[in-house]
């Protein structure tokens, strides 16, 4: 072997996960482009757009999936949603366990990164429990939807549609097989409750769900779990009330519905914008205040280690508490008698700042390439970033450049700003300490 030959490329866990995810998107795009997958031919760009949308559990679609894809194509979408939602490494661990092989240290480190865990201890057991819990929830959800849909559609279609929409709901992907999404079920209690509860559970994050299942008492729950549960309740209630107040006089959305349908629609649309892009009213007809409020919800997003996107609800909560502490003149940020480390606050600020800058730059770029209002463009970008999937009817009309930009935003939103930064840069620790310097701010 000659000296000076290049060393084999060593990838850290974030880089490996990013590459594995891109590989999933490419394979999905190729499968969706196959003649067996479509009723009518679609472009390569649309195939990769939909593959990215499914793998990132977003739900934005330039074409109607229900009328475009064959059963094979829809199953490919379903698999992409499931693998993308629960994580590639989680499924890789399942395969290794089934084959009866040992899981090495490198695989455990990948699992630790994928599941966002502070240590290696118990990550394999956690992955197995995550899979079992997910499959159980999807079985329950599919059964509930089947009770409503089988009598209306027949056994085969009813069961299949129940399974597809349950997987999409639990993984917080707003894909539906009807051109109007779920608008035809605006007043249906079973559909509204089943889909919304699956979305909430999927959006809480498995660490919260398992903490609640194992501890069962409020006192024993971790600070993260308590914060997620309280913030989820507050944000959901505020969203439901706000949407009802903003839209109840709009004849194109809630105004034309009965009072019970208005209440169901407000409830459903209040819960889904943070994580899953299902809709029972026409999003393109929303009044401007509602659209702006939904942009905020989509930006905040779901919980850490969940199937949803956004900057994450706890990130937003930490920033709010830190700002309040600063305004009160306190040097430390305290949440329920627990001091939050400065590194966590800086991490939250970094995530929010990078995300806002990225959204601004992409929205600015889209104003140059697309013929649409700034509000519709911002809505589309934040929906892609939050891996939500709601659109003001803009996705089918995007230009080629516009679609490529939205694909990039969906990937950025799914992988997360810090994961991408760690993939590119190698964080270095230094023992050098410099004297303090003062800078005027504000």
Q: What label would you give each PLM region?
A:
Residues 1-442:
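Membrane-proximal intracellular helices of multi-pass ion channels
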């Amino acid at each position: 072997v000659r000296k000076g030959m290049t060393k084999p490329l060593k990838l850290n866990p974030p880089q490996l996960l990013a590459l594995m995810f891109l590989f999933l998107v490419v394979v999905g795009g190729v499968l969706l482009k196959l003649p067996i997958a479509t009723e009518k031919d679609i472009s390569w760009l649309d195939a990769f757009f939909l593959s990215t949308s499914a793998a990132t559990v977003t739900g934005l679609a330039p074409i109607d999936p229900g009328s475009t894809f064959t059963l094979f194509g829809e199953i490919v979408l379903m698999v992409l949603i499931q693998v993308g939602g629960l994580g590639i490494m989680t499924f890789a661990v399942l395969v290794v366990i089934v084959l009866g092989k040992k899981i090495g240290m490198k695989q455990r480190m990948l699992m630790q990164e994928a599941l966002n865990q502070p240590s290696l201890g118990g990550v394999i057991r956690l992955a197995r429990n995550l899979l079992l819990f997910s499959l159980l929830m999807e079985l329950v959800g599919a059964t509930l939807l089947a009770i409503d849909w089988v009598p209306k559609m027949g056994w085969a279609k009813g069961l299949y549609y129940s399974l597809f929409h349950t997987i999409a709901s639990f993984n917080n992907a707003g894909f539906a097989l009807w051109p109007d999404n779920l608008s035809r079920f605006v007043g249906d209690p079973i559909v509204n409750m089943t889909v919304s509860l699956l979305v909430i559970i999927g959006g809480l994050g498995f660490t919260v769900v398992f903490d609640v299942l194992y501890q069962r008492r409020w006192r024993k729950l971790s600070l993260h779990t308590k914060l997620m549960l309280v913030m989820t309740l507050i944000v959901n209630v505020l969203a439901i009330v706000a949407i009802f107040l903003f839209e109840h006089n709009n004849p194109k959305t809630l105004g034309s519905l009965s009072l019970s349908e208005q209440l169901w629609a407000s409830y459903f649309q209040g819960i889904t914008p943070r994580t899953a892009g299902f809709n029972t009213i026409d999003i393109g007809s929303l009044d401007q205040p509602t659209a702006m409020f939904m942009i905020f919800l989509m930006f905040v997003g779901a919980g850490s280690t969940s199937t949803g996107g956004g900057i994450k609800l706890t990130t937003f909560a930490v920033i709010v508490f830190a700002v309040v502490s600063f305004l009160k003149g306190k040097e430390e940020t305290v949440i329920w008698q627990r001091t939050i480390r400065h590194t966590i606050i800086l991490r939250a600020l970094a995530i929010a700042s990078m995300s806002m800058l990225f959204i601004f730059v992409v929205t600015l770029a889209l104003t140059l390439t697309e013929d649409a209002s700034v509000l519709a463009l911002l809505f589309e970008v934040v929906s892609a970033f939050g891996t939500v999937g709601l659109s003001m009817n803009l996705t089918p009309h995007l230009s080629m450049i516009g679609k490529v930009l939205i694909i990039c935003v969906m990937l950025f939103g799914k992988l997360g700003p810090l994961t991408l930064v760690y993939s590119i840069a190698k964080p270095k620790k230094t023992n050098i300490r410099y004297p303090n310097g003062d800078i005027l701010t504000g």
